[in-house]
Each structure stands twice: as C-alpha cells, then as structure tokens.
C-alpha cells in the first residue's frame, strides 16, 4: 500500500518541482561585475534582477536617481526625461520617452519615485512604479501600462555599496512576449554599465542629501 501512496504523490511532486524550476532566477548576463538574472513569473513577461557592487555612497546613488533630467546619459535608450511634479525631497513624479527598435513604436513612461531608508540597517530603497493615467497619452508613442522597479542599496563601507535591482514590466504594444523576453536583459545590463561611469561624476560624489545616512 505504501508504494501505491508514493505513486499517487509522484505527479504532485514533479508538478511542484517543475513550478519551482520555472520560478528560479537564471543568470543571463555577466560583465564588469554586473550580473543580470531573469525568471518566469506569474505574468507573461520575465522578471529581471540585477546585482552589482559600486564604489559609491548611498548619497551618490540617490543623487543620481533623483537627477531625472540626466537619465538620458545612462538609462538605456531614454531620449527624454524630466520631472512632472516634485512632491518632496525624496518623492516625485517623472516622465521619460524610450526609443525602441524598428518596427516597434517608441514608448513613454509616467512614473512615481520614492526613496526610503531603514533606520537600523541603513539599506536604502528606491521604488519606481508606473502611473500611466497621470497625464494624457500621445498618439505617436505607446504608453507603458505597467512598470515596477526597485533598487535595494546596502552600504558595504564608507565608499562602497551593493545594489540589488528588481524589475517587472509590461511594455505594452503588440510585440509578442517571447520576443520581449528574448532581449529583456539587454537594457538593464547596458544601463548599469553606464551607471557605473555616471555615478562617479563630481556632482554626485560631492552631493549631500539630508534624509540619507551613509
């Protein structure tokens, strides 16, 4: 009887193991100390995770991420970026346009950004969530309907930090999910390579943010 019970549970076991395998993070790209992972989640578009260590303080990183107008200098294929509304020193709404490869239409993103910090661990969280209905869409751009981006930044020393980055996105438009997933790790990798250079600029290295403890 015991073997029969075990036999009955085999399909359940393999189903559970298969689900876990599908949800496991898979390393897709590694370059210059940057690791980019992806996994299949509940949505049709892959989730993305990035990991890197950067020679920068929390303040340097926060200053760069709050400097929305400069996103065009490092964020992959961003062609325009500006603040829509500054709510406080650590919170704002912003707008960006993103160039995509032909024949796909270019995208635009409307988003809310908020920075928080754990008072005990000092880990800084930068959370950006799309707000697609905040302003009217334009007919020549596809409005990204959903984007959820999180930076978890942990201080390692007075001059070095570890970044763990998470992204879930639905880019909108008619492109099939399999095609989007095929190239989903390229944008974060290219962005982080430029980010490592951008964050070393004097205006970030010399910055002071009162609500961040390094």
Task: Walk through the language-model features, giving the residues of each.
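Eukaryotic helix-grip
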Residues: 22-214
């Amino acid at each position: 009887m015991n073997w029969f019970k075990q036999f009955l549970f085999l399909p359940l076991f393999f189903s559970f193991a298969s689900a876990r395998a599908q949800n496991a993070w898979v390393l897709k790209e590694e370059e210059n100390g940057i690791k980019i992972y992806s996994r299949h989640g509940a949505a049709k578009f892959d989730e993305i995770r990035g990991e890197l260590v950067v020679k920068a303080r929390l303040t340097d990183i926060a200053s760069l991420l709050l400097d929305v107008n400069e996103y065009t200098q490092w964020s992959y294929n961003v062609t325009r970026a500006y603040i829509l509304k500054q709510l406080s020193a650590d919170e704002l709404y912003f707008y960006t346009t993103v160039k995509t490869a032909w024949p796909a239409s270019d995208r635009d993103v409307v988003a809310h950004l908020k920075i928080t910090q754990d008072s005990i661990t000092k880990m800084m969280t930068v959370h950006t969530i799309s707000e697609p209905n905040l302003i009217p869409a334009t007919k020549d751009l596809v409005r990204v309907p959903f984007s959820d981006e999180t930076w978890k930044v942990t201080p390692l020393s007075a001059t070095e930090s570890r970044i763990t980055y998470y992204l879930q996105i639905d880019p909108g438009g008619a492109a099939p999910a399999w095609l989007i997933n095929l190239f989903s790790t390229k944008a974060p990798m290219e962005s982080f390579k430029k980010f490592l250079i951008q964050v070393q600029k004097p205006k970030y290295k010399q910055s002071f943010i009162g609500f961040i403890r390094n």
